[in-house]
C-alpha cells in the first residue's frame, strides 16, 4: 500500500512539471535563433586565393575574366548617385542610357577597388594569365572604365572592357558570348548571372561576395548553384 502511494505521488509530481518544461508562456513574435542553429554552417565550397594559386601551379597561362560592379569594384556610390538623380526610390535609372553614359564616362573614379580583386589579379598576372573584364553594363561612345581599371589593378596587358548590355545574342545570359569569345577558363563574379553565364559557357565560375552595404539588392545566395565561393571577398 505504501509503495502504491509513493508511485502515485511521483506520477503526480512528474505530470505537474511537464507543462512547465514544454510550454511557452507566449508565442514568439520574432524569428530569433538558438544555440544549435547558430552552430550550423551551410555546405558551401569555400576557397581562398592561396588555394587557387597552389592548384594552378604548373598549369599553362590561361584567359581569366572578371565582372566589374561589386566584383572588382565597390561601385555602389555611382549607382546610389544615379538612382537619386534619375529615379529616386526606384530602379528605373538602370534602364536609362543617360545613367550608363555618366557611369562609363568616369564615375568609376569614385568606385573603390576591392582588395580581393587586387589579390586575385596579382596572382593571375604573376602566372602570365590574360585578364578580361566582362560587364553587363550598356556601352556608350566614351569608355572611361578601361583606364580606371588598368590603373586601379596595374593591368600589364589591358584589353578593352567588354560591355555586354544591349548586345544581340543567342545565349540566355548576356556575359556568355564574351566568356566564349575570349576562351576564358575561369570567370569571377558576384551575381547569379555571372555563375550561370560561366555554366552556360562551360567554364569554371567562382563567386565573390557582395559587400553588405551594396546598393545591389537583393543579396544572392552564396553557393546556390554549387559554385566555389572566395572567402573574405566582400571587400
Curated annotation (Swiss-Prot):
A Pfam family annotated for this UniProt entry: Acid_phosphat_B
Binding sites annotated in the UniProt record for Mg(2+): 67, 69, 190
Binding site for substrate: 135-136, 175
UniProt entry keywords in alphabetical sequence: Hydrolase, Magnesium, Metal-binding, Periplasm, Signal
GO MF term list: acid phosphatase activity; metal ion binding
Cofactor stoichiometry and binding remark: Binds 1 Mg(2+) ion per subunit.
Record InterPro entries: Acid_phosphat_B-like, HAD-like_sf, HAD-SF_ppase_IIIB_AphA, HAD_sf
List of catalytic residues: 67, 69
Subcellular location field: Periplasm
Record text on subunit structure and interactions: Homotetramer.
Main function: Dephosphorylates several organic phosphate monoesters. Also has a phosphotransferase activity catalyzing the transfer of low-energy phosphate groups from organic phosphate monoesters to free hydroxyl groups of various organic compounds.
UniProt record similarity statement: Belongs to the class B bacterial acid phosphatase family.
Name the record gives this protein: Class B acid phosphatase
Source organism of this protein record: Aggregatibacter actinomycetemcomitans serotype C (strain D11S-1)
Amino acid at each position: 500500500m505504501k509503495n502504491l502511494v509513493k508511485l502515485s505521488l511521483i506520477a503526480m509530481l512528474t505530470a505537474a512539471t511537464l507543462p512547465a518544461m514544454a510550454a511557452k508562456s507566449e508565442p514568439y513574435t520574432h524569428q530569433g535563433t538558438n544555440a544549435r542553429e547558430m552552430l550550423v554552417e551551410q555546405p558551401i565550397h569555400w576557397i581562398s586565393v592561396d588555394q587557387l594559386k597552389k592548384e594552378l601551379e604548373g598549369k599553362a597561362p590561361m584567359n581569366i575574366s572578371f565582372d566589374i560592379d561589386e566584383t572588382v569594384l565597390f561601385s555602389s556610390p555611382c549607382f546610389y548617385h544615379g538612382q537619386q538623380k534619375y529615379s529616386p526610390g526606384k530602379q528605373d535609372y538602370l534602364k536609362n542610357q543617360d545613367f550608363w553614359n555618366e557611369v562609363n564616362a568616369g564615375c568609376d573614379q569614385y568606385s573603390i577597388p576591392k582588395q580581393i580583386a587586387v589579390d586575385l589579379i596579382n596572382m593571375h598576372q604573376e602566372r602570365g594569365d590574360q585578364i578580361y573584364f566582362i560587364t553587363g553594363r550598356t556601352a556608350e561612345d566614351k569608355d572611361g572604365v578601361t583606364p580606371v581599371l588598368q590603373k586601379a589593378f596595374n593591368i600589364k596587358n589591358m584589353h578593352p572592357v567588354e560591355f555586354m548590355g544591349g548586345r544581340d545574342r543567342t545565349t540566355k545570359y548576356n556575359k556568355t558570348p564574351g566568356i566564349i569569345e575570349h576562351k576564358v577558363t575561369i570567370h569571377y563574379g558576384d551575381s547569379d548571372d555571372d555563375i550561370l553565364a560561366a555554366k552556360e559557357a562551360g567554364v569554371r565560375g567562382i563567386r565573390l561576395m557582395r559587400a553588405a552595404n551594396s546598393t545591389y539588392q537583393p543579396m544572392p545566395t552564396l553557393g546556390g548553384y554549387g559554385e566555389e565561393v572566395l572567402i573574405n571577398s566582400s571587400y
